[in-house]
Each structure stands twice: as C-alpha cells, then as structure tokens.
Curated annotation (Swiss-Prot):
This is Cell division protein ZapD. It comes from the Bacteria. It comes from Burkholderia orbicola (strain MC0-3). GO terms for biological process: division septum assembly; FtsZ-dependent cytokinesis. It is found in: Cytoplasm. The keyword Zinc does not apply. Cell division factor that enhances FtsZ-ring assembly. Directly interacts with FtsZ and promotes bundling of FtsZ protofilaments, with a reduction in FtsZ GTPase activity. Keywords: Cell cycle, Cell division, Cytoplasm, Septation. The keyword Translocase does not apply.
Amino acid sequence: MILYEYPFNERIRTLLRLEDLFERFAFFLAQEDPREHHVALTTLFEIAEVTGRADLKSDLMKELERQRQTLAPFRGNPGIEQNALEAVLGEIEQTLANLAQMQGKTGQHLVDNEWLASIRSRAVIPGGTCKFDLPSYYAWQQWPAEQRRQDIAKWILPMLPLRDAAAIVLRLARESGQASKVMAMQGSYQQMLSGRSYQLMQVRVPPELRVIPEASANKYMLWVRFTMQDGDVRPRAVDIDVPFHLTLCNL
C-alpha cells in the first residue's frame, strides 16, 4: 500500500516538513560523493529555516509535557505493557531535557559562521556555488568524505533535539489512529467528523490502482478525491470506485 498523509493544522504540517527534511539530510549525509554532501548541506540550511520559527521549540515542549502527563498515570496499570510505557516516558523526558538545554535562536550558529553563511547565501542562486564563486567551498569538497561528514554532522547537532521531539509527536499521533477500509464511489469519498478534532489523516491505496488522493477537511467533514496521471499531463479525476484505507489520528 502507498501511504499519503495530510495534516489538519499548521503545527503537524511543520513537523511533517521537518521529518521529510531530516530524512533527506540523513540519506545524503551517508553518501560519499561531494555533490551528495552538497545536497546534505543545502538541506541543513532548509532545516534551519523551518526550525528558526520562534514558537516551534516551545510548542514541542508543551506537547511533550502534555503527553508525559497523559501517560504517567498509567504506570502500574496491569492492562498496560509497562516496559513499553517506561520506554516512551523515558524518551519524552530525555527529549524535554535536551530541548531545555538549547540556547539562543535555533540555527544561529550557522548565521554566526561567516563561511557557512556565504555558502548559504550563494546556494539560493541557481548555479551559485560553482568553484569560481566559492573556491574555499570547492576545496572543502575535495576533502575525504568522512571528514566532510563529520563537519556536517557537527553543524546539525544543535538542531537534533527538535528532530527527536518532532519524531515523538508524529509517532504518537500516528499510533493513535485506527485504520478502516472504505470505498470512494466514483473516485470521491466524504465523511462527517461531528466536530471531533483530528491532527492527521492517512490514506493508503493499492499501488496497482495508480490513483492519487487529494484531500481537504475542516472540523465538520473530510473529503478525499482520487485522480490519475498519464505521463506528464495534469492529473484528472477518476470515475471508478476506489477501495482504500483511511486512518484519522488525534493526539
């Protein structure tokens, strides 16, 4: 099944963006070629843009504290797997401690590093990091892969508590959902939400159908419409019945 996820609010949208960026960063950092490490570095700059929001850290700390207070009373409950509970609570508490230790504005260390700041300013220009534009950056790219990797890992380090916090919040949200098998009649599906507040919607579709879900929702109703794309033309609405799995997640 192919999984599509749709956030119901700006906070979850931001966390999904962060998750995607950190996954891309980790993939390219693990590679060997200087061009792949260039992608890792430019992705690091994107992460700094997203995490630079003034309220992101405080939002994550509030949510983790709320989850800790929700889960802590289940300690000693015979109906709850205690080892799993303690593992989650320990992870939350450690991440809260790491967030509390973060000093200053997120990503400020990148701004304060003049060399990185020069690369960052050139990276937004198409072709702006050629060897004649940034000879010192080109020289750095000729260093051994492991040395480049260590440098980039050092630069991402101050932002890792935010990655860990986002991962916990998204995991708890995803685990809260119950999947149901539904049918989009003639490619369209609607469901009343009765005012219930959800954080995230997951749509899983069989890959062989080659359909693409488009979703929208408010506090009263959600709507999923399926489209199909032929080559490089704009996707078109389908008029066939589409079976899929729908999961609504709420922290």
